[in-house]
């Protein structure tokens, strides 16, 4: 969905200031109110907290009292990525941290990040970073030892 936000004036019927319009098709727009924008921010906060076990879009829309289409379009327009891309980015950042700072196995890291199968974690990590989690860990460790060697 290509999304583009445009400002719009006060809505005379609801007496609410429109937050903007999101283009969702050639001639289709969704209007967001300030209340909708607040719900999208709340959804973002929930996803940040629950990235390892994110709610479905249907459940998330009920949690923030916003229909699924507005939630998906508004989230993409505000954060320039889909809801699943956002949760994956958080998980991958957490994975980088765990790989760099712990000796946990790839299976243990995958479980901590909410993956039922470590192979799915490895595929997503490789897609995101261009290398497997194990290769990432080895490269990070090599880099740390190299810096240590240079400083001593």
Language-model features: locations:
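DNA-contacting interfaces and partner/effector-binding or oligomerization modules
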Residues: 1-12, 152
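A short, Lys/Arg-enriched amphipathic alpha-helix from helix-turn-helix/homeodomain DNA-binding modules
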Residues: 13-54, 88-104
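Basic/polar phosphate-binding segments, predominantly the helix-turn-helix DNA-binding elements
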Residues: 18-25, 42, 46-87, 112-132
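Short, positively charged and aromatic/hydrophobic N-terminal segments
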Residues: 21, 148-152
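A generic structural signal for secondary-structure junctions
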Residues: 33, 114, 138-141
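Residue-level marker of structural boundaries
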Residues: 52, 80, 92, 104, ...
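Short, basic, alpha-helical segments at the C-terminal edge of helix-turn-helix-like DNA-binding modules
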Residues: 87-96, 135-148
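Hydrophobic positions on the alpha-helical face of helix-turn-helix-like DNA-binding modules
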Residues: 106-110
